Amino acid sequence: MLHSRVSKVLVHSLTSALLAVGVLGAQERPGDKGETAEAKKLRGRPAHPKPSEIDSAANLDALLSRKDKGAFSEAKGATIEGYVVQVEREEDGDYHLTLASAAGETDTKKWVIVEVTPAWQKKSAELTGNNLRKLLGKKVRVTGWLYYEPDEDQPDPRGTRWEIHPVTDIKPAS
């Protein structure tokens, strides 16, 4: 009986400790907004989209004009081109790059957000903060996964809730 109680206490303590350090369950990062496990999974995808997974209809203009959640599939990736008009590091470690069809665009309704996660920053030198900041004002081609940002009360301005998140590749565009 005593052995059984001690075992239960030890299992409970070990489980609590593993949850606390993020070994079990979804690990929270600073700035997490309490999103669902599914949202975290989508935003944390570890692989590049395969060519067969790229939605060729999902370009910058299409993301801005087809804004509803059913317009695209989060199971697909996309490659979009645009000028980088903002680069910001968020509290959760993601880098938000704002893309628009014109350099220096100030109309937020013409902006698309693409996000580079800390995991992808570690995977590719092109995706580190220093290199991302160098892209400001330049035209780029961004590849990654389509993601619909559900937080409609979010104060940041944008032209659409559709994002590329995570970004898996950025290259200069001609």
Regions of interest found by a model, annotated:
Residues 1-7:
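N-terminal secretory signal peptides that target proteins for export/translocation
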Residues 10-11, 162:
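Short, functionally important structural connectors and interaction interfaces within domains
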Residues 12-22:
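Bacterial N-terminal signal peptides
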Residues 27-174:
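OB-fold and OB-like single-stranded nucleic-acid-recognition modules
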